[in-house]
From Swiss-Prot:
Transmembrane segments: none annotated. HAMAP family: PyrH_A (MF_01220_A). It comes from Methanocaldococcus jannaschii (strain ATCC 43067 / DSM 2661 / JAL-1 / JCM 10045 / NBRC 100440) (Methanococcus jannaschii). Keywords: ATP-binding, Cytoplasm, Kinase, Nucleotide-binding, Pyrimidine biosynthesis, Transferase. ATP binds at residues 9-10, 47, 51, 142-143, 148, 151. It is found in: Cytoplasm. This is Uridylate kinase. Its main location: cytoplasm. Pathway: Pyrimidine metabolism; CTP biosynthesis via de novo pathway; UDP from UMP (UMPK route): step 1/1. GO terms for cellular component: cytoplasm.
Length: 226
């Protein structure tokens, strides 16, 4: 399979900060998935690093567009750290376009992207990359174990979806953007790209174990299809 993994920055770079052993744990899982015969591409979010730089930028009077650029640079730093851990399985350059990522993939290596354009989340980048390279599966690794109707970290009665359509995902993202206190695992732009491209998506808890499970066809999360 050709698989795009979308890793939230908070998954790879948690609040307590980056740890080399944790990064290597993820790298080893991706190496294993590739060794099993899959083609692997990765998009990494900015996490704590991006949030801190964006906050400082705003305090210093930077425009939102400039803060977006700070966030993009942070995602690329995270991508470069993962590339370093991947060693010969990747190329020591963060691709900044889908064409470049596909070229690396076609060379038998693992491309690791960060952000690309101001205003676009790395979720949207991952969905666009999956569409561009005609991926068989987009895996979204988050800090929760699937898509819920509201934030399960805040609401005990949050309902998890085992399966849903892309249109249902879009509707949920719209609803979440309008309701105070609500949040969607997948943002609206990414959801619309998923719907447009008719992508098959698995939303799972972004642990190394669950990412490996997905490559084996075991999805302990939400499947989005159709």
């Amino acid at each position: 399979m050709r698989i795009v993994f979308d890793l939230g920055g908070s998954v790879v770079m948690p609040k307590e900060g980056a740890k080399a052993e944790k990064i290597m744990e993820y790298a080893n899982i991706f190496k294993k998935i590739k060794d099993e015969g899959h083609e692997v591409a990765i998009v990494v979010g900015g996490g704590k690093t991006a949030r801190e730089y964006i906050e400082i930028g705003r305090e210093l009077g930077a425009s939102e567009s400039f803060c977006d650029e700070l966030g993009i640079m942070a995602t690329r730093m995270n991508a470069m750290i993962l590339i370093t851990a991947l060693g010969d399985y990747s190329i020591k350059k963060v691709p900044t376009s889908f064409e470049e990522a596909e070229l690396i993939l076609n060379l038998g290596k693992i491309p690791v992207m960060g952000g690309t354009h101001p205003g676009h989340t790395t979720d949207a980048v991952a969905a666009s990359l999956a569409e561009f390279i005609n991926a068989d599966l987009l895996v979204i690794g988050t800090n929760v174990d699937g898509v819920y109707d509201k934030d399960p970290n805040k609401y005990e009665d949050a309902k998890k979806f085992d399966k849903m359509s892309a249109k249902e995902l879009v509707d949920l993202a719209i609803s979440s953007s309008l309701k105070a206190g609500s949040s969607s695992v997948v943002d609206l732009l990414a959801a619309k790209i998923i719907e447009r491209a008719k992508l098959k998506v698995a939303v799972v808890k972004g642990t190394p174990e669950e990412l490996l499970n997905v490559s084996k066809g075991i999805i302990n999360g939400t499947i989005i299809e159709g």
